[in-house]
Amino acid sequence: MKIIFNADDFGISPGAVYGILESYKRGVVKSTTLLANSPAFDLAVEVAKENPGLDIGAHLTLTFGSPVLQGLETLTDDDGRFRRNYTALENGLADVDMNEVERELTAQIEKILDAGITISHFDTHHSIEPLIYPVQHKLAEKYGVSIRRHSDVSDFGAIKTPDLFATEFYADGVSFETIKKLVQEHIGTNDVVEVMTHPAYIDETLREISSYVEPRIKEVSILTSRELQAYLGQQEVEIISFRDL
């Protein structure tokens, strides 16, 4: 089997940037996805350019912070900010203009590209793929990138995806045993499994803007541990990135 350890939220805070960098340089993370509207976007771009082996994707969002574009009436609240989570977006989906969705997501992608970063894949913040999949699919075809797999779609056409998207390594599931169990379920197969991760060093920016905080430092510890890397080696698990699909 092959595993992609993808670190979400690249750029959400300086601590997240450095936590992901540590998980790449000393651990098993080879792919990460960058938030174009994040507070530490410029730092993330700088770190990405200094570490060209770190595979970068776009962490497309309609539920975090403010949009890259202005005047998106169906996607924002009275303060011009995105709705705060999946449920809020889903509840207002009937009123959302999908043309606005495409324009904004394109702007996020182009901002990353304009910063000199090559993008290999797309995923989304708060896993909103089921709500916007036709737009995401169209943009993936346009930019020639891979996407994160999700259970609502069975046929991804010519777009490359892993065979499985694993969300178990999150919150109370952040443990070596979680990854070990996943490996045991797929060992001896040709499956490519993406494991969602959120490693970060905790800082005030992260505390202010994210509800998922404390487990992130534990993720750094596990993803950089010799125990995990030795186990994956013993099981002959190949660690790859989205570039390798």
Curated annotation (Swiss-Prot):
GO terms for molecular function: deacetylase activity; hydrolase activity, acting on carbon-nitrogen (but not peptide) bonds, in linear amides; metal ion binding. Mg(2+) binds at residues 59, 125. Pfam families: YdjC. SUPFAM superfamilies: Glycoside hydrolase/deacetylase. Its cofactor is Mg(2+). InterPro entries: COD_ChbG_bac, Glyco_hydro/deAcase_b/a-brl, YdjC-like. Keywords: Carbohydrate metabolism, Hydrolase, Magnesium, Metal-binding. It is an enzyme of class 3 (hydrolase). One of its GO terms (biological process) is polysaccharide catabolic process. Its EC number is 3.5.1.-. Homodimer. PANTHER family: CARBOHYDRATE DEACETYLASE, YDJC DEACETYLASE FAMILY MEMBER. Probably catalyzes the deacetylation of acetylated carbohydrates an important step in the degradation of oligosaccharides. Belongs to the YdjC deacetylase family. This is Carbohydrate deacetylase.
